[in-house]
Amino acid sequence: MILHKMAFLAVILFFLISSSSVCVHSRETFACDTKDAATATLRFCQLSVPIPERVRDLIGRLTLAEKVSLLGNTAAAIPRLGIKGYEWWSEALHGVSNVGPGTKFGGVYPAATSFPQVITTVASFNASLWESIGRVVSNEARAMYNGGVGGLTYWSPNVNILRDPRWGRGQETPGEDPVVAGKYAASYVRGLQGNDRSRLKVAACCKHFTAYDLDNWNGVDRFHFNAKVSKQDIEDTFDVPFRMCVKEGNVASIMCSYNQVNGVPTCADPNLLKKTIRNQWGLNGYIVSDCDSVGVLYDTQHYTGTPEEAAADSIKAGLDLDCGPFLGAHTIDAVKKNLLRESDVDNALINTLTVQMRLGMFDGDIAAQPYGHLGPAHVCTPVHKGLALEAAQQGIVLLKNHGSSLPLSSQRHRTVAVIGPNSDATVTMIGNYAGVACGYTSPVQGITGYARTIHQKGCVDVHCMDDRLFDAAVEAARGADATVLVMGLDQSIEAEFKDRNSLLLPGKQQELVSRVAKAAKGPVILVLMSGGPIDISFAEKDRKIPAIVWAGYPGQEGGTAIADILFGSANPGGKLPMTWYPQDYLTNLPMTEMSMRPVHSKRIPGRTYRFYDGPVVYPFGHGLSYTRFTHNIADAPKVIPIAVRGRNGTVSGKSIRVTHARCDRLSLGVHVEVTNVGSRDGTHTMLVFSAPPGGEWAPKKQLVAFERVHVAVGEKKRVQVNIHVCKYLSVVDRAGNRRIPIGDHGIHIGDESHTVSLQASTLGVIKS
């Protein structure tokens, strides 16, 4: 009997192992199947042959019709060469998403880890965290690819600048600062793609190039919008994240946008695609259109007279892949009409097929490849969920804390009223471009882990159109030891296709907050969920609301993270990655006005902290802690000589063109002592700003470095920051030339400042 049971268990174990193997490797071999004798010996299938030669061999075997069938996101199969069809469009903005058709949840892959929305994660100012998230997302992406339910080409991240606070997609971005956006882009991309420059774990894509930050405002939509942008703003704002993504992140793809820039659709502009991305920055990858944007430039923008001209213009400009059917429908006729050469099509395929080969898609059996072991057991793991919680904790920003109202205490605040339309939020917490989360902890569930809760929504939803639920909310606050109001926005207010018209809380939310605060017995904590900034000046000024927290969209573990912050299990260290403007900022400021700098003749106030110096609700970089940190600039040079290449004439006026300076290893080293003089251990986000010498070129200040450092109570830590002079202390003139201003540059870290003088020199001798 025992032997029979053992035999039965052995059979069950065999089937479990077998089914697990099937789950991991349920995808058919994409190409170069070693079991297919007809194709296994083809040169493009030989791993010993360099990838460029394999790509050329494959293209040489294709007919024109077959080549064109590979130009769209839904690439056709080439059965005679043993190549399966492939869907290029997958998304992984902050976790594997099912927005694109390349990824489907279900079966043994019901979900994936959903991290905080990008704007929240960026508030951590933690580049190592950003890269760690990328590694987790790519592990889960590879696992789903192995299981036949995901792709390997992910059109993420979105690295556009949050230029205008009304933009519905601001939540997807790394905020308003171009250096932060670029650092985020490079870090997340490295996490996604891995560290092998010749091989890829997955292929990332930085989007949407360029000057795209308007979806649908006041009758103007992204499909019709012509962004009129100066060379100065292109160089020092809009292009910076993309340049860093390519040069520092080695991204495998760039996506061009729907809008025109100075009258030319971005996806048909050779100056943007071929000259800038490909030749100047050295993209090692492919350029893809935003979905249907090639069709948009013909059908909607009427940029060309015929569809064949639109196809030809896009490919000749440097576009390699069309998200949509347009190139597939019109490229053959463009070749027949001599608008396009077949070699132009070949050049596009070189870039896409090279990426597929770097991904291992032409290397045969998945199981034999470096990531072939990944499967269902590697998705939604406890470690991944823990990182999602950590990311939310690090990104949450404490905006106000008068009288040390926070953290709450489970002993003193035994009963907490949890009120507001986002108090029981789940899907709202993951923002847009998300997938199916592993599970959710809502704010009220998180707080219930620390205290008894009285839950009243107060508003049916974030639109808060009436006050019929107000009385119950007020009564809950009257009877509780503390009150937490979870208010804000969701995707019905701000999203793709939805730009805001106001920075105020929607509907009657402000009235609910004020009425509850007035009646509450204990401290009132306002928690905000949003991607963009909100004008909550009323709450900042209200003494009955002693604490305010911005949670952004904190991801699947958001409720736990919020509760951990409120009750002090985690010490907040996040900083705002965007300026919070008052509602009055929008007066006479159309979203269509692209100038970053003030335009006094039009009463345009300037955009972002770099160029706007008017009143704010909260400034860029604002964020409090439960402890207190001090800075001391312990060591920094007072003079840095800038060696000039060639003749003395390269020093013009009060600046040196970066192209004329010897920039290699030209670095400003600053040693900063950070001391925790408070009563709790904490992590401090140190932001380093530069104030260049005055002049019409220069921003009033610009972020040049940031570091996140954990400091225990009473501890002092010395942090070294190295600032690349040519990259970060330069400014851009009106012609779009990057220059190093000669003279005194102020370096500011909190309340500490230091002046360093940059001086031109020849052969080590400083020139006045």
Curated annotation (Swiss-Prot):
GO MF assignments: xylan 1,4-beta-xylosidase activity
A Pfam family it matches: Fn3-like
InterPro entries named among the record's database cross-references: BXL (IPR044993), Fn3-like (IPR026891), Glyco_hydro_3_C (IPR002772), Glyco_hydro_3_C_sf (IPR036881), Glyco_hydro_3_N (IPR001764), Glyco_hydro_3_N_sf (IPR036962), Glycoside_hydrolase_SF (IPR017853), Ig-like_fold (IPR013783)
Disruption outcome: Partially redundant with BXL1. Bxl1 and bxl2 double mutants have shortened siliques and curled leaf edges.
General function of this protein: May be involved in remodeling of xylans during vascular development.
GO BP annotations, alphabetical order: xylan catabolic process
Entry's family note: Belongs to the glycosyl hydrolase 3 family.
E.C. number: 3.2.1.-
Keywords from the UniProt entry: Extracellular matrix, Glycoprotein, Glycosidase, Hydrolase, Secreted, Signal
Enzyme class, spelled out: hydrolase
TM stretches of this protein: none
Tissue-by-tissue expression: Expressed in leaves, stems, seedlings, roots, inflorescences and siliques.
Catalytic residues (UniProt): 290
Organism: Arabidopsis thaliana
Annotated signal peptide: 1-23
Upper taxonomic lineage: Eukaryota, Viridiplantae, Streptophyta, Embryophyta, Tracheophyta
Glycosylated sites: 126, 648
Protein name, as recorded: Probable beta-D-xylosidase 2
SUPFAM superfamilies, alphabetized: (Trans)glycosidases, Beta-D-glucan exohydrolase, C-terminal domain
Location in the cell: Secreted, Extracellular space, Extracellular matrix
GO CC entries: extracellular region
Principal localisation: secreted
Disulfide bridge positions per record: none
